[in-house]
Design a protein with these regions (language model features):
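An N-terminal assembly and electron-transfer interface module characteristic of large anaerobic redox
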Residues: 1-356
Length: 356
């Protein structure tokens, strides 16, 4: 049955992805809902909510506000909030409610800017898609709104696509900046995870952009078209703290001749999964994901899952010797008898790596 889940919990939706991108940019983030969606974002999908301050609020829509489309009341609420809070911009994130009533996001953005004098952007998420779709829209809108012409700084790179939903279960926040700084880049900017809105404004100064998740590709393409900034899809395998040990464990099970005969499945977001595949060049490895997959990076045998039943059937019909995936997915395939190596994906399980 389509949409039926007996083993897997619901994955993070698009509005959570939008909020994850904007969380560290010192903006006033309004979830356009009655309260439930904002509660899910802060309570389940945004781990930084418990560790740092971020102005994420519910619009608190009432029945008649939604039915009559009282955008003026929302704008009035936002204006009052801005009198008490300092924000560099205002973001309104959509949910199923505005999708159903047909909210005019462009008009809403203009009304907010006129009322407050603060830059506003709106993200037309609708709660029916997954987190990566919301991230994709938000990254692109953010750079379209704020990035301006700048002279290129040699040795400066920008990292696009990092959020806790992509990596929150497996790495420390400053890992990517440290990793690329050690690769002789003079300045490393990680948008949304360590670097704020000023970095977005200066995005054109980057000599190159590194895209670490599929959700960042649309923004990287925009920056390439607008400012000529080249980009590369890459996510270092060392982002997984135990990767060296896990790689040695897998290699220890198999010698070089056996490796080419064994089937391995890696399940995560596509950029990271592809990077891990390259670590075992001689092996028969397929990449799978529940989230967007870039056609240019997708190999013939790679697979995109949509339903829980798709996952169960696929594992039954394909005898993999090793699976590298979030442990939550293992619950749906108790019959699997091969080797399983945990690779956390926060958007799937909501689980973070336990500090040792």
């Amino acid at each position: 049955m389509k949409g039926l889940r007996k083993y897997l919990s619901p994955f993070a939706p698009d509005q959570s992805g939008a909020a994850a991108v904007l969380c560290e940019f010192h903006g006033l983030i309004i979830i356009l809902d009655a309260g439930g969606c904002a509660g899910n974002i802060c309570g389940f999908d945004e781990p930084r909510w418990f560790e740092s301050r971020s102005a994420i609020f519910s619009a608190g829509l009432r029945d008649m506000d939604a039915i009559l489309g009282r955008d003026d009341r929302l704008v009035e609420k936002i204006g009052k909030a801005c009198e008490k809070l300092s924000a560099d911009f205002i973001a309104v994130i959509g949910t199923p409610v505005p999708a159903v009533i047909g909210t005019d996001y462009r008009a809403l953005s203009r009304m907010i800017e006129k009322k407050t004098g603060i830059p506003a952007l709106t993200i037309d998420t609708d709660g029916t898609k997954l987190y990566d779709d919301g991230e994709k829209k938000t990254w692109k809108e953010l750079f379209k709104k704020f990035a301006v012409e700048k002279d290129v700084e040699p040795g400066r790179i920008g990292i696009i696509g990092a959020t806790p939903l992509e990596f929150g279960g497996i790495y420390e926040e400053d890992f990517l900046k440290k990793y690329f700084a050690e690769k002789s880049f003079s300045k490393v900017v990680c948008y949304g995870m360590g670097d704020g809105l000023d970095a977005v404004r200066e995005a054109a100064a980057a000599e190159k952009n590194i895209v670490v998740s599929p959700a960042g590709i649309a923004a990287a393409k925009y920056l390439q078209q607008k400012f000529g900034t080249p980009y590369e899809l890459f996510c270092p395998p060392e982002i997984i703290p135990e990767w060296k040990e896990k790689k040695e464990q897998v290699a220890g099970l198999l010698n070089v001749e056996e490796l080419s005969e064994k089937k391995i499945l890696i399940v995560h977001q596509q950029v990271l999964a592809n990077t891990l595949r390259e670590e075992f060049i001689s092996a028969n490895i397929n990449v799978a994901s529940w989230f967007m997959m870039n056609k240019e990076q997708k190999k013939e045998q790679d697979i995109l899952f949509k339903e829980e039943d798709d996952w169960i059937t696929y594992i039954k019909e394909n005898e993999y010797d090793i699976i590298i995936a979030d442990p939550l997915l293992k619950k749906a395939v108790p019959f699997y008898k091969g080797e399983w190596y945990d690779l956390l994906h926060f958007a799937i399980s909501g689980k973070k790596r336990q500090s040792v």
